[in-house]
């Protein structure tokens, strides 16, 4: 079954759900996908009274991203790979004129670039060149595996050993085949004008996680977030529809290069995963509450 805000209370037996349970959750800002699974799994085990209950997700989201994360319980975990293969839609905030090693706000700016020539029209005209199947170089700091080890773990290890980020990138570079089907500029902010940078819901789609909510995440205290909004750099909010495995951070990097500048992601929301939209997703609190109803 698919759990949504209007679903009837769950029974106490997981056997009543032979195909398992899928919960579309709006992942909070600064939570890892593992944080969400940990919270839901604890509630599900208590609710169904089954210690070996399987709980997983279909498609990870970066800590600084919000939006649809599909949580699978019981037999639904067998559907995770299929659910993950469906196309996705994102709403991304892209800041031009500067880059970061992680291509988002987890790392501080490492280089500045000219940006006076960038306009709303120029951004819109550049987007069609990204439509279609293409090879994409994954970010150095990513969840992609290299010989069975997460790339970000290897990147941090190599960096700690004294290698520069460029040297680490040469060892860990990975290219994937992706497909971008739609791109649209939703907003554009000229240099020096106020913007909604660091807003995990750049177009008002879904609530912004409060600091109190973010503090519940075990990872939030160790996830760095830089604030570059005071720099007054140009910024665009872009809607993207794409295939599994597309890194929106890498798209931001490539868009900046195409425009003769640099760029990084300042906000990201997965607004859709397959048929599941963020408007119909549950908060973590709603999911936990649904798993605590008395029967």
Range-by-range predicted roles:
Residues 1-295:
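Catalytic/RNA-binding core of pseudouridine synthases
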């Amino acid at each position: 079954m698919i759990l949504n805000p209007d679903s009837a209370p769950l029974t106490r037996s997981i056997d009543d759900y032979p195909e398992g349970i899928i919960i579309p959750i709006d992942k909070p800002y600064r939570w890892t996908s593992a944080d969400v699974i940990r919270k839901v799994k604890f509630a599900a085990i208590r609710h169904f009274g089954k210690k070996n209950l399987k709980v997983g997700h279909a498609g990870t989201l970066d800590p600084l991203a919000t939006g649809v994360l599909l949580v699978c319980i019981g037999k639904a975990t067998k559907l995770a790979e299929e659910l993950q293969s469906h196309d996705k839609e994102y709403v991304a905030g892209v800041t031009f004129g500067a880059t970061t090693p992680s291509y988002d706000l987890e790392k501080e700016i490492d280089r500045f670039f000219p940006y006076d020539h960038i306009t709303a029209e120029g951004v819109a005209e550049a987007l069609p060149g990204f439509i279609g199947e293409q090879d994409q170089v994954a970010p150095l700091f990513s969840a992609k595996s290299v010989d069975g080890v997460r790339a970000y773990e290897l990147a941090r290890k190599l960096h700690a050993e004294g290698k520069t980020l460029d040297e680490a990138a040469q060892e860990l570079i990975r290219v994937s085949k992706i497909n971008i089907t739609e791109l649209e500029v939703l907003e554009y902010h000229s240099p020096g004008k106020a913007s909604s940078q660091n807003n995990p819901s750049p177009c008002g789609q879904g609530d912004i996680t409060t600091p109190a909510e973010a503090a519940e995440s075990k990872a939030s205290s160790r996830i760095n977030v830089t604030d570059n909004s005071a720099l007054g750099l140009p910024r665009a909010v872009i809607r993207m529809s794409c295939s599994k495995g597309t890194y929106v951070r890498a798209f931001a990097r490539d868009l900046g290069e195409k425009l003769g500048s640099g760029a990084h992601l300042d906000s990201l929301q997965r607004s859709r995963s397959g048929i599941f939209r963020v408007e119909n997703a549950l908060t973590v609190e709603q999911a936990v509450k649904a798993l605590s109803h008395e029967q």
